[in-house]
Regions:
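Periplasmic c-type cytochrome electron-transfer domains
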Residues: 2-15, 47, 69-74, 89-106
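Short N-terminal micro-motifs specific to bacterial/archaeal maturation
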Residues: 21, 26, 66, 88-91
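PAS-family sensory/regulatory domains
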Residues: 62-64
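Short non-domain terminal segments
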Residues: 21-22, 37, 60, 101
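Short, flexible, glycine-rich and Lys/Arg-enriched loop motifs at helix boundaries
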Residues: 54, 66-69
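Periplasmic/extracellular electron-transfer cofactor-ligation site
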Residues: 32-60, 77, 83-90, 106-109
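N-terminal export/targeting leaders of redox proteins
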Residues: 1-33, 109
Length: 109
């Protein structure tokens, strides 16, 4: 009986871990989609739909090595606090900012 309970417990744990992996995998895709949607609605007007910036506005090219070499903390700080003419997005949660940084990283050349 005790051996059966151990096997049942191990199977339950394995099922829970598998379910958690599946849930987090789909969540990550949703977060990427959410970050892309936020980029399109809040950022693309100045940074361009492709993230390459707009020369007339002197906005940075997110695909450039100069932007891509910045640390996640630096990019997060600019998103959260703004810089120059860029407004601060203080209402974004830390997870949303992290997802936006990941999206910006995906734009590299």
């Amino acid at each position: 009986m005790q051996t059966t309970m151990k096997h049942l417990g191990a199977k339950t744990l394995a099922a829970a871990l598998l379910a958690g992996t599946c849930l987090f995998g789909s969540s990550a895709k949703a977060d990427t989609a959410a970050a892309e949607a936020t980029f399109k609605s809040k950022c693309a007007m100045c940074h361009g739909a492709d993230g390459k910036g707009k020369a007339s506005m002197k906005t940075p090219d997110f695909t450039s090595a100069d932007v891509q070499k910045k640390s996640d903390a630096d990019l997060s700080g600019v998103i959260t606090n703004g810089k120059g003419k860029m407004p601060a997005y203080k209402t974004m949660t830390p997870d949303q900012v992290k997802d936006m940084v990941a999206f910006i990283r995906s734009l590299k050349k």
